[in-house]
UniProtKB/Swiss-Prot annotation:
CDD domains: PT-DMATS_CymD. This is Tryptophan dimethylallyltransferase cnsF. Disruption phenotype: Abolishes the biosynthesis of communesins A and B. One of its GO terms (biological process) is alkaloid metabolic process. Tryptophan dimethylallyltransferase; part of the gene cluster that mediates the biosynthesis of communesins, a prominent class of indole alkaloids with great potential as pharmaceuticals. Communesins are biosynthesized by the coupling of tryptamine and aurantioclavine, two building blocks derived from L-tryptophan. PANTHER family: INDOLE PRENYLTRANSFERASE TDIB-RELATED, PRENYLTRANSFERASE ASQH2-RELATED. Pfam families: Trp_DMAT. One of its GO terms (molecular function) is tryptophan dimethylallyltransferase activity. Pathway: Alkaloid biosynthesis. The lineage of its organism: Eukaryota, Fungi, Dikarya, Ascomycota, Pezizomycotina.
Amino acid sequence: MGTHDMSPNASHSYIYRVLSDILEFPDNEQRMWWHSVAPMFAEMLRACGYDIHEQYKILGIWKKAVIPFLGCYPTNDGPRWLSILTRYGTPFELSLNCSHRLVRYTFEPINAATGTDKDPFNTQAIWESLSQLRRLNGDVDTELFNHFKANLTVDNAESAHLVESNLAGSKIRTQNKLALDLQNGSFVVKAYFYPTLKSAATGRSITDLMLSSVRQQVQKWSPTLAQPLSVLEEYIEARGPDSTASPRLLSCDLINPERARTKIYLLERQVSIEAMEDLWTLGGRRKSDSALAALDIIREIWSLIQLPPCLASYPSGYLPLGTVPDEQLPLMVNYTLRPDDPMPEPQVYFTTFGQNDLHVTNALTAFFERQGWTELAESYKENLRAYYPHADQETANYIHAYVSFSYRKGVSYMSVYLQTLETGDWPITYSPKRQYLCNEHPIHLKELAKACA
């Protein structure tokens, strides 16, 4: 076996190859989605220690219930729905919970009506997608989903109003997406809502829409959420009308509403350690020993990742596939409102998209070692090479989208959110990517030429 065959490569995953031999796809779009993403997905499951039965089950469910809702395979010269999920507008993303070695994925459900006159703002596809997931997991509860869906996304009349009045413009058109946490032989579903279009259609602010919908949730199902919600509202109001932080989206667990967590996400344009400290402490409101201990860890992560300080704005457009990013995105935070906690619990996001991936990898590896996550520290860099064996590992700056951190009961939680498209041997096996190759493409042309020789 040659040295090329011995190098890390997700396309060599045994489970991916077995399933590729036996699975059938109704069309070429779904087949391409499978071969583009499944190598990385299968390898990530293996690396995280999922047993072989779980790996087959997870990939089988993804093929059956998720791939059909990813829409046409993305190219630069074909029409497609652009999702806010990634800067390239692609509707699927894998992430890794580093502390628990758990895999999760997020996707924006898309169907044939998405973006057409029947559903110009992709309001409807998520219903069909959720129905599929509920058939596979009867524990999925949609009561809270129905509540936020009605309050934060446009209905048919509002959709028509947006079209007729041309109010959508360049605003975010993604309204909802789903995420699956893969654990205990099954999955837990979360839903995310972006109220930007609802705000445009109703004239109400995003902040008002989100907070009022949570107040209704408190009154109907979760009175114990009133206290953490009050603290968060006070913080947002205290930041003032000129604040660089603003509410962006909301998420909830699709479980019994009385036990479900709700998360409110803020975008922070000021990229600095001081801004992140303010987000973490809620402007000094979180003063517990645990919160302050975590603050030291956040400073440590900041010193390792070294995001360049700036005042950043989230771009209104999307990057063409294959573009090398040259941008710094804003920071982000979510505040979890729990029925058993009077204080909102923050999870901060280091926006690493556009930063050198080798530098980020080395920073994460150092942090893993300090946390005692030895196995992950030893394997993380090789795993990334396996996911993208034909990328220039020295110069790539598009693989790590976010690194998130939270801290609960003395335990650090970190997740990484990774670019998930055209993994493994895709660049040398399937032609759609080749037509976009240029000297600036993240795939190293010398390696590509060598592989194709």
